[in-house]
Amino acid sequence: MKLQSLPCYCATLRQAARAVTALYEEILADSDLHATQYTVLQALKLVPNLTTTDLAVALGIDQTTATRTLALVRKSGLVIDTPGSDRRERCWALTSAGEAAFRKLKPRWEAAQTAFEKRIGRAEAEALKKASYLAATKLAAG
């Protein structure tokens, strides 16, 4: 059976998200990181010293998922956490190993971006990215 076009926005976006994730995971397959983990490194490269909550908000994920993903990359020695403004808060940054992993995997990530654009078209990829970001920001705002 082939992929079905569904009448539901949620289901269709989830189909797309799974397909995109599979593409990126395939390209990153022999690395030690999953797409979700590389995304965390990418976010911390752009904005170091984010709190767990700020990282979750920035990525549009829940706190539990952020905590779990951060624990995995910390265990790999790619990020370090330091106390935040209160005892419960943790701030996260890349370690030198995290910086190196980010640089090492960046060409693969760019290859995944290119593969995505080749499969659906560059203009369509850009339009989808803009529409997805618009939806995420408007829906997150309530």
Label each region the model flagged:
Residues 1-31, 93, 100:
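N-terminal leader segment of winged-helix/HTH proteins
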Residues 47-51:
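Short capping segments at the starts of secondary-structure elements
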